[in-house]
Amino acid sequence: MVRKSWMESLFPEAVVIVVNNGARLLASNDPKWGPIIRGFHPEAVDRVIGSEGYIVALAKSLNAQHFILDPMWMAFPANSIEVREDPFSHWKSIPDHVRPYFQKRLTLVGPESTGKSYMADFLAKKFGGPYVPEYGRPYEKYRSSGDYRAEELHFIVDGHVAHRKTLSLKAGPILFEDTDPLLTAVWAEMLLGHSLPDLEARIDLPDHYILLDANVPWEEDPLRYYSKQELRQEFFTKIKSKLEAYGASYTLVSGSWSEREAQSVAVVKEMLKTPKLHGGIDAQK
């Protein structure tokens, strides 16, 4: 349950009880709330805390004290409905553990030397970071020499996903990501000569991709593999095919570096126009 997990993360020593019996249909000041709460919590209630006046009557029905928290909405100038409808405008008021639910993820993919790392850093600095770096680069830097093995690519995905989960708690409304399991699956095809179905089973599509074209000059780097333009183009074609095979939402970004920046900024601005869509928070259903 989404809200229950949030509360348990924020207050690990508290016992969180979910009232999920249709009581949500009652008005907040309905006197039936007292018996409903006693049914879920038969023990004595010492205090009822809230930011609205209805808690006074609720506390009385439970023989408890009331405590109205921030009644003028100065510390938290928005209610839960406003946050859900426009979370990006209230981002600073959303606790870290809640942010990933409302966050959108934008992943940068493309062949080597097309600006993935640069663009992820650029966008994070412009719109608020941090961003999720490519885990494969430090792995490549410190690995032993020799051909890649399938299990190494799984290890790279493990590291990347773990970093993403942690960094998402501190990121802005858009989580910028350099590379992901889908691109790692394409790397498997390039390095091993065949696909890895068990690796592809781990693909989790973001809200949107930026696919960077290979039409910029190659920049030499000891951690890079495919400098020949025909191999870069093959890599690009494989990525594009993989995106389309999985029905991924993506924008092709091409041209000079300044053109790539402008196109990428436009993508982010479009993503920020609407909140992330959900079927609803389970505790509200």
Spans of model-derived segments:
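A glycine- and Lys/Arg-enriched "phosphate-lid" helix/loop adjacent to the NTP-binding pocket
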Residues: 192-259, 272
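Nucleotidyltransferase catalytic core that binds NTPs
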Residues: 1-104
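Conserved lysine of the Walker
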Residues: 116
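Conserved substrate/cofactor phosphate-moiety recognition/catalytic segment
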Residues: 121, 125-166, 264
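Hydrophobic anchor at the beta1->P-loop junction of P-loop NTPases
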Residues: 108
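Conserved nucleotide-sensing/catalytic segment adjacent to the nucleotide-binding pocket
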Residues: 145-196
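C-terminal accessory "lid"/substrate-recognition subdomains
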Residues: 251, 259, 265-285
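The conserved Walker
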Residues: 112
